[in-house]
Amino acid sequence: MKAGSFYKLGLLVASAVLVAACSKTPGSADGGAAVGDGDATAQGLGQMTHFAGQEPGESYTTQAPHNQLYLFAYDDSTLASKYLPSVNAQAEYLKTHPGARVMIAGHTDERGSREYNVALGERRADTVAEILRMAGVSRQQIRVVSYGKERPANYGHDEASHAQNRRVEFIYEATR
């Protein structure tokens, strides 16, 4: 009976991964991630009514901070200093919006084992989360996940593609 449950769970997870892998990001013709300094709004913010933990009708801004994507060097979990002002802007946003929640997702390129890459992605996300905590953001506002190499931003197999996949993403979580 347990084997059947694990089999069903495996099928469910495989289906979810397949659906996620086949979907395209809106506005991206090649499925690649766009890296830029423009204003970025949190996903789904236009359709939501409030952040988790925030009362409906309580005011909030729909403009998330700049640079919700941070790239890393190969096999490294050290955040480049050029990203610190942007991470600090994220921290200020979270401190002034205590109802806001953010998921920090760590990613790697395709090189290396699954286990190693999940651990590396987690170290990358933890690095950014620790900067937020040191800046005064509540632990309850931060959730860290690692996808390792399972959710590439770019499906290419060259160094430029690998560089886009070695990243941490901020994903603001909202409730309806």
UniProtKB/Swiss-Prot annotation:
It is found in: Cell outer membrane. Residues 60-176 form the OmpA-like domain. InterPro entries: Bact_OuterMem_StrucFunc, OMP_bac, OmpA-like, OMPA-like_CS, OmpA-like_sf, Pal, Pal_lipo_C. GO terms for biological process: cell division. Residues 1-21 form the signal peptide. Gene3D superfamilies: OmpA-like domain. Keywords: Cell cycle, Cell division, Cell outer membrane, Lipoprotein, Membrane, Palmitate, Signal. It comes from the Bacteria. GO terms for cellular component: cell outer membrane. It is a lipid-anchor. A lipid is attached at C22 (N-palmitoyl cysteine). CDD domains: OmpA_C-like (cd07185). Pfam families: OmpA. A lipid is attached at C22 (S-diacylglycerol cysteine). The Tol-Pal system is composed of five core proteins: the inner membrane proteins TolA, TolQ and TolR, the periplasmic protein TolB and the outer membrane protein Pal. They form a network linking the inner and outer membranes and the peptidoglycan layer. Part of the Tol-Pal system, which plays a role in outer membrane invagination during cell division and is important for maintaining outer membrane integrity. Very strongly associated with the peptidoglycan. PANTHER family: LIPOPROTEIN YIAD-RELATED, STATOR ELEMENT OF FLAGELLAR MOTOR COMPLEX. Belongs to the Pal lipoprotein family. This is Peptidoglycan-associated lipoprotein.
